[in-house]
Amino acid sequence: MASPSDHRLRSTPHESANCGSGSARRVYRPNVTRSVAVPREKSADDRVLRPTRLLAAGIIPFLVTGFLILYIVPGRTGELFAWPIAPTMTAMLLASAYAGGVWFFVSVLRTRQWHTVAEGFPPVVVFAGLLGGATFLHWDRFTHGHVAFWVWTTLYVVAPFLVAWVWLVNRRTAAPAAPDEPRLGAWTRRVFVAGGVVSVSLGVVLVVVPGLASYVWPWAITSLTGRVIGAVLCLGIAGFGVLRDDRYSSVVGLVEVAMVMATFVAIAMLRARDQIEWNRPLAWAMGAGVTAILVGGGVLLTRFRSARRPVGERR
């Protein structure tokens, strides 16, 4: 049985008739292969998947509501929130984290590139997981008959798993960085990591031994509120994200979130200045940290915008 190659090399009838002639030449028909376009691999197109956007859209209303209660009327948490929070500085600190969360998840809805928001998901998982753990550790401190308590409990039991799931799934679409993309310098990366180490270390102390931390904390805290503040500080693990992805485009969103949080914390410290014990070093350290985030973040955002402009437009 003739193979396909035999058919491609078979001579024409005219050639076959003259195959005995020495002058006859066999002409072979070329085997032309058409090029087939290979579709782009969808798993590396850097898009934000629908489940990720849906989760972001579902979380935003809860964060907005929590922010309005805790920041606008922090003295009414006993009647409006999952548990009465005192003093108001703690309520406003948690509200500042919610404000940063709103900014982050709105960015998730708006962006078309997964890598620009990817590093923000692990901190959310840690934050929500720690608040869920604090809820069960201090179950008796909550107002069980209030709808806000059940919303709080459901949110912080479910959210860590949902956020972790969408992050793991959406990571499959991550595209590699282009060679010419602007990146952070070595010293800037070290500053990010150092800030993360300080924030997370203090957060871990508050989560593990809140009673001990209360002796040095700038305002009055309980075991529950100490662990809540610790969860907020553990959002600092976002600083470690530069070890995985140090592109400006991957970092700028996290810087914006940090600046939003720092702005509201600074205002809260002014509003609750009578609650803060300014003779404690951590009070001034917190003020310095907030200032560093606002100033350093502003400088970095300016550099990022400059790097995005064409060379001829830079000054």
What are these regions (language model features)?
Residues 100-175, 264, 268-271, 278-307:
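Hydrophobic, ordered structural segments
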Residues 59, 121-130, 185-198, 255-264:
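Transmembrane alpha-helical segments of multi-pass membrane proteins
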Residues 32-47, 171-187, 312-315:
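Membrane-interfacial, low-structure loops and terminal tails that flank and connect transmembrane helices
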Residues 72-78, 136-143, 207-214, 270-276:
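Juxtamembrane "helix-exit" motif on the non-cytosolic side of transmembrane helices
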Residues 89-106, 126, 224-244, 260:
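Core segments of alpha-helical transmembrane spans in multipass integral membrane proteins
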Residues 49-68, 174-246:
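Surface-exposed interaction/gating patches
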